[in-house]
From Swiss-Prot:
Disulfide bonds: none annotated. One or more lysine residues are methylated. Keywords: Methylation, Ribonucleoprotein, Ribosomal protein, RNA-binding, rRNA-binding. This is Large ribosomal subunit protein uL11. One of its GO terms (cellular component) is cytosolic large ribosomal subunit.
């Protein structure tokens, strides 16, 4: 028989840096989950991706056990890393803060493909280009 799901918790946690402090501790603690067990498992799973923000979906069951799924980093984080900028433009349509090539956008789209609802790579590239445009990053 399948376990009864109590809730799904969605968080964005820096890879390899999960610890019991907020926001992780309170989010898991209110559902009775062993926080340190999650932190150790998450840090082990995201070991090679230091410096990236990793979205995670934690499924909590009635017996206080849990499973979690890590997703790919947000497109905005990948674009900022590729363009080597700290943040996007305050006025995206007026001032451009960086340039990325279409090949770089295609690499990001390939990485993000499992989490995007795009049918093919071209649609995924257009999605990433839209994110870049809204951040003030020009695609060449």
């Amino acid at each position: 028989m399948a376990k009864k799901v109590v809730t799904n918790i969605k968080l964005q946690v820096p890879a390899g840096q999960a610890n019991p402090s907020p926001p992780i501790g309170p989010a898991l603690g209110q559902h009775g989950v062993n926080i340190m067990e999650f932190c150790k498992a998450f840090n082990a799973r995201t070991q090679g991706q230091e410096g990236m923000i990793i979205p995670v979906v934690i499924t909590v069951y009635a017996d206080r056990s849990f499973t979690f799924i890590t997703k790919t980093p947000p497109a905005a984080v990948l674009l900022k890393k590729t363009a080597q900028i700290a943040k996007g433009s305050n006025e995206p349509n007026r001032t451009k803060v960086a340039k990325v090539t279409r090949a770089q956008v295609e690499e990001i789209a390939k990485l993000k493909m499992p989490d995007l609802n795009a049918r093919d790579l071209d649609a995924a590239v257009l999605t990433i280009m839209g994110t870049a445009r809204s951040m003030g990053i020009e695609v060449e």
